[in-house]
A protein has these predicted regions:
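Conserved helicase motor "Helicase C" RecA-like lobe of SF1/SF2 P-loop NTPases
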Residues: 506-533
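N-terminal pre-P-loop "Q-motif" helix
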Residues: 28-46
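A substrate-engagement module of RecA-like helicase motors
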Residues: 2-25, 30, 77-208, 269, ...
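A contiguous, basic/glycine-rich beta-loop/short-helix subdomain that forms a polymer-engagement track
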Residues: 175-210, 219-228, 343-474, 481-488, ...
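Conserved RecA-like ASCE P-loop NTPase motor core of nucleic-acid helicases/translocases
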Residues: 80-89, 422-423, 499-511, 633-635
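Conserved RecA-like P-loop NTPase helicase motor core
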Residues: 459-460, 471-481, 533-639
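Signature of the SF2 helicase/ATPase Hel1-core->accessory helical subdomain module
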Residues: 66, 72, 92, 97-100, ...
């Protein structure tokens, strides 16, 4: 007999235990002790109101474990639960697979909905407006055809979101028709009753569980501090893939201004060369068009200054800049244009025009404020820098971020909600079996102060499934002879695994040099090389890798984590260097200086734990199921030569380790 707790909810054992609801429904379900332990702890945290950090090894089934806690609260009617993920893949897994599976076995019903950012939804009123103005809004081949395809889709779609659209429209076309906060007539709109965005919002209001991504969660947290919101009220937060939240918070609590973004914004208002844009049709808009031309000219001068500064000085400083490092000839021009659009909004009799003008004025106002903020460097505790990218180094980004995002996250998240559960396969930099101490580094980075921790190890048999090879005789990675020696070692291990390998780097420059040295040899061995940065995006590289035998993928940062290749396609992961962050990045430099000022040793309190967590992520690419087997190879001899090296080995699951000398292999 299965006992229910009524308004107390549904306990973890009743759902996931050996004789629970899931096991009764699916005979092939294996009740895992680690999953059950995690589910109980999540349930306890949410019932008793404390924060919890859980490191759940690969194969634990952590989504079922935290969903058990969420369902318990939903059935007990204790409040709405927000589940946040970093990747779309995990969102889809939750909404399309895991949650429906549990809805199937839980007699007391609960509802779950996926939350998308407002810009993912079509606005029918703006679609009509764009259709009327299309000859002047769109200039490139195919854009008007895309608009027609969107209009046809709008008649049949139930969802009205970009992911439901069968074509991939250009950013210009979608921006002209997407739902926007400052460009919404609300209940006054003739389409309000059938509005895709508001329909989705109403379903979120009634859902027990909302699934969102980290970017949407932090947008909501930032807006709530200003008295607004993009999500309905929720009472509990579960953050999966939580190791990414520091980086997401950097973006949301910092500044990001792109040269392309400014030019694109101005072009959408009026492109002087093509005579297209929102202001192109109105003979009364000549003054505003002149202001757009002036903004274009000022932007060219401004970014030419930035580019010259970077070439002469900035590159040596890693891009870090001082206040007023270039003259501000742009923000006052943006202000003039903003005031011009505000004036036009007041004078026009066309309500649709009015909303468009007001929205652009808001965007210009935000840009103007951020530009002044960046140049004056008004925020204490932030670092400001310039990034220059692209083949001709013409993509310019102005960036700022807090040196310590912890206080920001603490204030907006941990102080606001009684129970926040954070989970990932890589949160702790301590050894297996260690409890809270290993989590203190992560907790300190994200402002998590009063919390409990759980390390739920993997159910996989790593001692049987993995062999770790360490090249103990290779030169130090900073030695000039390292790349040549590393290439010879890479050849050995690729022959041993027949390709089917990830080779993980910490820099593009070393990746490119290694690829150039090995390209012909790989061709001779009939192994196909996929090198990141050669034109294919990450998703296409992965699809290609999985479908081809004897494939070798060279990857940097984005391939160390969040990549899932189960089965024989991936049998070898080669880690070229221990993944210490490059210390010449302004943000890393600033954090190192801050720690020195606090009297700490930045290597042991920041650089080493960061590298250990990333090393765990790289190691974790190999074993994704209980039948996977293979090797992990470390070419960085510091892991056996330096006293700190043993901390890397202690942090990964226990497996067979072999230190190889040049003669041994």
């Amino acid at each position: 007999v299965i006992a229910f707790a009524g308004q107390e909810g549904l306990n973890a054992d009743t759902l996931l235990g050996p004789e629970g609801l899931v096991a009764a429904k699916w005979p092939l379900f294996e009740s895992r002790p680690q999953q059950l332990e995690m589910a109980r702890k999540v349930q306890q945290a949410m019932r008793q109101g404390f924060h919890l950090a859980v490191e759940a090894g690969t194969g634990v089934g952590k989504s079922f474990a935290y969903l058990a806690g969420a369902i318990d609260q939903a059935i007990g009617q204790k409040g709405k639960i927000l589940i946040s993920t970093h990747t779309i893949n995990l969102q889809q897994q939750l909404i399309e697979k895991d949650i429906p599976s549990l809805q199937d076995v839980v007699p007391a019903g609960f509802t779950a909905r996926l939350a998308k950012g407002r810009g993912h939804y079509l606005c029918k009123r703006r679609l009509e407006y764009a259709a009327k103005r299309q000859a002047l809004l769109f200039d490139e081949d195919g854009q008007q055809e895309q608009l027609a395809a969107i209009a046809a889709w709008a008649e049949t779609t139930q969802d009205g979101s970009l992911s439901d659209l069968t074509i991939e429209p250009s950013p210009t076309v979608w921006m002209a028709v997407q739902s926007e906060h400052g460009n919404c007539q609300g209940r006054k709109c003739p389409h309000f009753g059938k509005c895709f965005y508001w329909k989705a919002r109403r379903t979120l209001e009634t859902a027990d569980i909302i699934v969102a991504n980290h970017a949407l969660l932090f947008s909501d947290l930032v807006l709530k501090e200003a008295g607004a919101a993009v999500l309905p009220e929720f009472q509990f937060v579960i953050i999966d893939e939580a190791h990414n939240i520091e980086h997401v918070a950097e973006d949301h609590f910092g500044i990001r201004i792109s040269q392309f973004g400014i030019i694109h914004l101005l072009d959408r208002l009026f492109n002087p060369r093509k005579r297209k844009g929102l202001l192109a049709y109105d003979h009364k808009a000549e003054e505003a068009r002149a202001l757009v031309r002036q903004c274009h000219a000022s932007a060219r001068v401004f970014f030419a200054q930035v580019q010259a500064w970077y070439a002469n000085t900035g590159d040596d400083e890693g891009g870090q800049c001082q206040p007023d490092f270039v003259e501000d000839n742009l923000s006052h021009k943006l202000k003039e244009l903003r005031l011009g659009l505000t004036k036009m909004a007041k004078e026009t009799s066309d309500e649709d025009d009015q909303y468009e003008f007001i929205r652009y004025a808001e965007q210009l106002g935000q840009l103007e404020a951020e530009l002044k903020d960046f140049l004056k460097q008004r925020k204490e505790g932030c670092v400001y820098w310039v990034e220059v990218e692209g083949a001709k180094r013409k993509k310019i980004l102005l960036r700022s971020a807090p040196l310590d995002v912890g206080p920001y996250i603490k204030r907006s998240l941990f102080d606001e909600y009684a129970s926040v559960v954070l989970t990932s396969a890589t949160l702790s930099c301590g050894g297996n079996g260690q409890k809270k101490e290993g989590f203190d580094f992560f907790a300190g980075r994200v402002g998590l102060e009063n919390y409990q921790a759980l390390q739920a190890g993997s159910p996989f048999d790593y001692e049987r499934q993995v062999r770790l090879y360490i090249e103990g005789d290779l030169p130090d990675p900073n030695d000039k002879s390292f790349i040549e020696a590393a290439c010879e070692s890479i050849k050995k291990y690729l022959l041993k695994s027949g390709g089917r390998a990830f080779v993980l780097f910490t820099s593009y420059s070393m990746l490119k040099e290694t690829a150039a040295r090995l390209e012909d040899w790989l061709d001779e061995q009939q192994m196909e090389l996929l090198a990141q940065g050669s034109g294919l995006d990450r998703a296409k590289m992965l699809t290609h890798f999985k479908s081809r035998p004897r494939c070798v993928l060279f990857g940097t940062d984005s391939f160390w984590q969040g990549v899932d290749v189960p089965g024989e396609s991936l049998s070898n992961v080669i880690i070229v260097k221990l993944p210490f962050a490059v210390p010449n990045h302004p943000l890393i430099q600033g954090r190192i200086e801050l720690l020195k000022q606090r009297g700490e040793n930045p290597f042991f309190s920041y650089q080493l734990p960061m590298a250990i967590i990333k090393f765990k992520q790289g190691f974790g690419r190999l074993i994704r199921t209980k039948t996977d087997t293979g090797m992990v190879v470390v070419l960085d001899s510091r892991i056996v030569r330096k006293p700190y090296g043993k901390q890397f080995i202690a942090a990964i699951p226990k497996c067979r380790v072999e230190v190889v000398s040049g003669q041994d292999f």
